[in-house]
C-alpha cells in the first residue's frame, strides 16, 4: 500500500518553486530508505517528473534572458570571473 497522497498535482502545472520544494522532499524521503520498494519506485518516478519540470522552467528562464539581453550577443552564459576581469 502506497504512502503517497492520492491526489498530487500534475508536475506540468507547478511553478518552479513548487516543483523544486516537492523534489527536495522526494529526495529526502528516498534517502531515508524507509519506504517499500513499490513506494520508492513511485517516489523515483515522481522525482523524475519534478526534475524535468524544474529543467523546463530553467530552460525557459535562460531563453527569456537571452532574448532580453541583446548586448550579450545571444550568449547564454556569463564569462568566467577570470575572463571578465581581464
Swiss-Prot record:
Q: Which GO terms describe its biological process?
A: DNA catabolic process
- Disordered, as annotated region: 67-86
Subcellular location, in the record's words?
Answer: Cytoplasm
Instruction: Show the Pfam families listed in the entry.
Output: Exonuc_VII_S (PF02609)
**Its job:** Bidirectionally degrades single-stranded DNA into large acid-insoluble oligonucleotides, which are then degraded further into small acid-soluble oligonucleotides.
Q: Which family does it belong to?
A: Belongs to the XseB family.
Descriptive protein name: Exodeoxyribonuclease 7 small subunit
Native species: Beutenbergia cavernae (strain ATCC BAA-8 / DSM 12333 / CCUG 43141 / JCM 11478 / NBRC 16432 / NCIMB 13614 / HKI 0122)
